[in-house]
Amino acid sequence: MENTLREFQMHELEMLKALSDKLESAGIRFYLIGGSSIGALRHQGFIPWDDDVDVAIMRRDFKRAEEMLCQLKAPFLYDPVEKHVIPDAPLGHIYLNDGRPLEEAPRIDVFAIDNVPDSSLCEKFQNLCSMIYHVCVLRRPAENRGKFKKLFTSAICNLCPKFLLDFLQKLAYKGVTAWQNKSTKYVSNIYGVSGKNEKVPAEFYGVPRYVAFEDVLMPIPEKAEEYNTHIYGDYMKYPPEEQRVPSHFGKVVK
């Protein structure tokens, strides 16, 4: 068991290298996003207090990527989106499966990036489908998504029997991903923590750009500076000291 956050991060770095090897062997692009992208640009590695890794894959490649990640060898374990071992959001996770509770294990969050339709009406339809898909995958109301979304998803969860949730899940998935093979101006990490701010010009992701991350080169969005500024503002500025804390590492060392 780790005694320091740095040891925790080093486990995640090994997991990231394994992910990179799997995806690149299949010709699948991925990007470090979120705090991992900031870490790459500001620290050339992990943000010193960060305790997970955020990775994004374009929706058109996502199912194939999940198939590859399910082949990771022990002690690494991939938890697919629709398996939802830990029901937090419809995204995939890679864990260090070493016997501890998975909620406390080193992990990589794996997000799908969806094309956003250019039509505002179609975008609203996609947003509706994303809410329905969320509750159908997790089988519980959406958290931290606003009062309306919580009420709406609570109604679906409480009123629909399992067979109907299964049907709605497949239908909603088709609605969310209907534009995956089309060229659109914008893309979004729909289930990212920044909500509507996750919608960015498609060119921000572009062709992955490799930069130093600890002792390896890892891909970030082509226009990572613009991407991070759009979502986080002045991302090169350190947050207040009281905010420089890990999300769940403390559970491990207590």
Regions found by a protein language model. Name each.
Residues 128-144:
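Short, cationic low-complexity segments
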Residues 63:
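Glycine-centered loop/turn positions within well-structured domains
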Residues 1-24, 66-118, 138-143, 150-233, ...:
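Conserved catalytic core of two-metal-ion nucleotidyltransferases
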Residues 20-53, 57, 66, 203, ...:
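Active-site nucleotide-donor binding segment shared across nucleotidyl transfer reactions
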Residues 120-125:
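A short secondary-structure junction signal
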